[in-house]
Swiss-Prot record:
Annotated EC: 5.3.1.12
GO biological process, any: D-galacturonate catabolic process
InterPro entries: Metal_Hydrolase, Uronate_isomerase
Gene3D superfamilies: Metal-dependent hydrolases, uronate isomerase, domain 2, chain A
GO molecular function: glucuronate isomerase activity
Lineage: Bacteria, Bacillati, Bacillota, Clostridia, Eubacteriales
Superkingdom of the source species: Bacteria
SUPFAM superfamilies: Metallo-dependent hydrolases
EC category: isomerase
Reaction equation(s) it catalyzes: D-glucuronate = D-fructuronate; aldehydo-D-galacturonate = keto-D-tagaturonate
UniProt gene name: uxaC
Source organism of this protein record: Clostridium perfringens (strain 13 / Type A)
Protein name: Uronate isomerase
Length: 466
């Protein structure tokens, strides 16, 4: 029986151990997509205790706590920080098979030096030890980033953001990690959402464009895109809950947009036409600036109306959708490619049934003398666990070139989540090692080591250059 989480954790063969310890563990972290708050990085936020650092914004943990029967008071309610931590610790031994068990213990081990497993029995001791480390070692936001050897962070930002904290970070010569905004025009895309008209008003104000038509909207967004670009933005992000392509005319889209500004009801077909038209327009702008477009496909959000009204979005009430995506996604990419305006693009699917869809879709639009121009993104959200990552790696390697893969992202709101890069790297090395051990690939350490370091760092560092 193997010891829990020893130095060879998840490394099941000798080749995997060599690849991880000699290659994967040696390169820095390039975290090009996350949801960290730029203000907390710029102000070097100091955490008051482990609960603030660990549980305040982690909907993965919140979902598990609800499933264990823990009252909402101890999850997002007003219970004390220690009581919230204690309830989480009480649940921990029962998370067998869940990646939260692995992530949590990696975080305790790497950032706090805690070797014990977390449980009701060890809760008090671990609470005191971690809080002492936070205080004595000054575990601020920047310190955690430095400890994890992170060299690049891509935050997720709204077009109306002033990016003041990104600017502040650029002026900090003592902080070596490059923190850059990502352009996420989510609120401009969701024409059926409550508050859409008010948001367009805010966009008009910050862009100094009177927005009365769809062309005005595109102009305003392009002004903000240029502002982001001037402040280091290389990456954009779109959430596509449903991918539905309809043919449309410019006149039709303008009419739909004006209807929304007038407060009229927009039906689902009109909303789909509008979002696709805007995505295609923005995609062309991204291509002109050599920016990367990320498409996150297939989330079914805010399923629980009662809890959405009580707590809000991004609180652990989202799940996997099962809509068809292949045809419509193909048409969107092709519309951009027809004019040679398809930007570098990363496609993520939340439903693993779509792994092979994306694994083959990316091959349709490669080219432009760019290795891996169109990427099948890493296992996302409900798939960023061992089985989900392995399925993504297998689909990509069998249907494309995993050697050109830009690797892992945290996609997280937590400063402790950088251990997910270690988790990914161990799984990657084990996957490649198994191919060698089973005789499916020769043991050529130099090329294998190069592939591993490329996937873990070098491919992304190259891909996200202007």
């Amino acid at each position: 029986m193997k010891k829990f989480m020893d130095k060879d954790f998840l490394l099941e063969n000798e080749v995997a151990k060599v690849l991880y310890h000699n290659y994967a563990s040696k390169v820095p972290v390039f975290d090009y997509h996350c949801h960290l708050v730029p203000m907390e990085i710029a102000t070097d936020h100091k955490f008051k205790n482990l609960t603030e650092m660990w549980l305040y914004h982690d909907h993965y943990k919140w979902r598990a706590m609800r499933s264990f029967g823990i009252d909402e008071e101890y999850i997002t309610g007003n219970a004390s920080d220690y009581d919230k931590f204690y309830q989480f610790a009480k649940m921990m031994p029962y998370l067998i098979g869940n990646p939260i068990y692995h992530w949590s213990h990696l975080e305790l081990k790497r950032f706090f030096g805690v070797e014990e497993t977390l449980s009701e029995k060890t809760a008090s001791t671990i609470w005191e030890k971690c809080n002492k480390v936070i205080e004595n070692n000054n575990l601020t936001a920047k310190k955690l980033i430095e400890m994890a050897n992170v060299v690049y962070i891509g935050t997720t930002d709204d077009p109306i953001d002033d990016l003041r904290y990104h600017k502040q970070l650029k002026e900090d010569i003592n902080f070596k990690c490059s923190v850059n905004p990502s352009f996420r025009p989510e609120k401009a895309m969701k024409i059926q959402n409550e508050g859409f008209k008010e948001y367009i008003g805010k966009l008009a104000e910050v862009s100094n464009v009177e927005i009365k038509s769809f062309d005005d909207l595109k102009k305003a967004l392009e002004i903000r895109l240029d502002y982001f670009y001037e402040n280091g933005c290389m990456i954009t992000d779109h959430s596509l809950e449903r991918v539905v392509f309809y043919k449309f005319s410019c006149e039709e889209i303008n009419e739909i947009f004006i209807k929304a500004l007038n407060g009229e009801n927009i039906n689902n077909e009109e909303a789909s036409k509008y979002s696709v038209a805007l995505l295609i327009s923005l995609g062309k702008m991204y291509a002109e600036r050599n920016m990367v477009m990320q498409l996150h496909i297939g989330a079914l959000r805010n399923n629980n109306t009662r809890m959405f009204n009580r707590i809000g979005a991004d609180a652990g009430f989202d799940s996997i959708d099962d809509g068809e995506i292949a045809y419509s996604l193909s048409r969107i990419l092709d519309e951009l490619d027809k004019e040679d305006k398809l930007p570098k693009t990363i496609l993520y699917c939340l439903n693993p049934k779509d792994n092979e869809v994306l694994g083959t879709m990316i091959g349709n639009f490669q080219g432009g003398n760019i290795a891996g121009k169109i990427q099948f993104g890493s296992g996302w959200w409900f798939n960023d666990q061992k089985d989900g990552m392995e399925r993504q790696m297998m689909a990509l390697s069998q249907l494309g070139l995993i050697s050109q893969f830009v690797g892992m992202v945290t996609d997280s709101r937590s400063f402790l989540s950088y251990t997910r890069h270690e988790y990914f790297r161990r799984i990657l090395c084990n996957y490649l090692g198994n191919l060698v051990e089973s005789g499916q690939y020769p043991y050529e350490e130099e090329i294998l080591g190069e592939i591993v370091q490329n996937i873990c760092y070098k491919n992304s560092a190259k891909y996200f250059k202007r």
